[in-house]
Structure formats: C-alpha cells, structure tokens
C-alpha cells in the first residue's frame, strides 16, 4: 500500500477537487500466472462544505483514479460548519474504525493525521482536532470520518428537534 498524499489537486470544470489517498496493487493468481490490478482511494470536495470519497479498480492506475473520482462525485455529502470549524464534538464509526472530531478555535488549523486531514481539507474545514481510534486502514478511517460529518447538526436543526419533541409531549 502506498500513500500518495503529495499528489497535486486536480480542478474540474464544476469546481470539485480530488485528492488521491492510497493506491493498492491487487494480484490475482490464475493458471497462466499473476494478474495485477490497481485499486485507488480518492477524496473529492469543493472546499465549501461538500465532500465525498470513492474507490476504483482497473488494470491501469490512471483509469482506477478516474473511476474513483466518478464514484466520489456520486456520494458527496454536505457538511454544516460554524466559521471554519464544526458545530460540535462527534464520534464517527465504521467497522472497527472510530474517529473523534472536535471543534477547534479559529487559527489552530487541522490537527488530524493522514486520511482525516485530507477529508477535512476537501470539505473546507480549517480548524478541527481529531483522534483516530481503532482501525487505521485508510478506507475505514475515511468512512468513519464521513459518518461523523453526517452526524453533525446545526444549531437550527437542534432547536427544531427540541420544538417537535416538546410539541409531542404536550
């Protein structure tokens, strides 16, 4: 497994950037020898509150990356933000991977490692603290981070939930 965090961001005409997280070489043993394919893991986002990820497999690396970018664009989510940080603390979970995300003061930057940092950067979140708990496999960490971002609620959402719960009690 090779991390490719140093790859350049590519801009598309719809203003969505993509960042390559990992490329894995997959080998299938067949009667005639070994067949090699590549699996790419890509995070896409517009740095304005929208982020997604995708995986792609192909016999050539560029084709795997293209497939991953297309898959990432199809499952983008919207992330609520307060300034340059997240509204509240949240724990994202996927498989055996857990990611704790905490809001941070303006100017403190992204205190996160590896895959979480890439997701936060692509979402446009500039100030956040995170801790990866459990699995450190990039795909599990990204899925747990996306799960945590999906669980975020804005202040208005919480007020609406409280009002609806209050009206049900009356």
UniProtKB/Swiss-Prot annotation:
Keywords tagged on the record: Ribonucleoprotein, Ribosomal protein, RNA-binding, rRNA-binding
InterPro entries: Ribosomal_Su5_D2-typ_SF (IPR020568), Ribosomal_uS5 (IPR000851), Ribosomal_uS5_bac-type (IPR005712), Ribosomal_uS5_C (IPR005324), Ribosomal_uS5_N (IPR013810), Ribosomal_uS5_N_CS (IPR018192), Ribsml_uS5_D2-typ_fold_subgr (IPR014721)
Gene3D superfamilies: 3.30.160.20, 3.30.230.10
PROSITE patterns: RIBOSOMAL_S5, S5_DSRBD
GO BP: translation
Pfam families cross-referenced by the UniProt entry: Ribosomal_S5, Ribosomal_S5_C
Annotated GO CC locations: small ribosomal subunit
Keyword Ribosomal protein: yes
Keyword field contains Ribosomal protein: yes
UniProt GO molecular function: rRNA binding; structural constituent of ribosome
Annotated ranges, domain S5 DRBM: 16-79
Annotated HAMAP family: Ribosomal_uS5_B (MF_01307_B)
Assembly: Part of the 30S ribosomal subunit. Contacts proteins S4 and S8.
Domain notes: The N-terminal domain interacts with the head of the 30S subunit; the C-terminal domain interacts with the body and contacts protein S4. The interaction surface between S4 and S5 is involved in control of translational fidelity.
Family membership noted in the UniProt record: Belongs to the universal ribosomal protein uS5 family.
Function per UniProt: With S4 and S12 plays an important role in translational accuracy. Located at the back of the 30S subunit body where it stabilizes the conformation of the head with respect to the body.
Name of the protein described by the UniProt record: Small ribosomal subunit protein uS5
């Amino acid at each position: 497994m090779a991390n490719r965090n140093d790859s350049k961001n590519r801009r598309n005409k719809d203003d969505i950037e993509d960042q390559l997280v990992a490329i894995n070489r997959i080998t299938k043993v067949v009667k005639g020898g070994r067949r090699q394919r590549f699996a790419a893991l890509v995070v896409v986002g517009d740095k304005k509150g929208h982020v997604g990820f995708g995986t792609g497999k192909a016999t050539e690396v560029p084709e795997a990356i293209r497939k991953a970018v297309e898959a990432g664009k199809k499952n983008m989510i919207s992330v609520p933000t307060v300034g340059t940080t997240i509204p509240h603390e949240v724990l994202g979970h996927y498989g055996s991977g857990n990611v704790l995300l905490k809001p941070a003061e303006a100017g403190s930057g992204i205190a996160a490692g590896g895959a979480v940092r890439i997701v936060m950067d692509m979402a446009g979140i500039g100030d956040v603290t995170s801790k990866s708990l459990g699995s450190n496999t990039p795909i599990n960490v990204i899925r747990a981070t996306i799960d945590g971002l999906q669980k975020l609620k804005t202040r208005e959402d919480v007020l609406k939930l409280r009002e609806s719960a209050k009206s049900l009690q009356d």
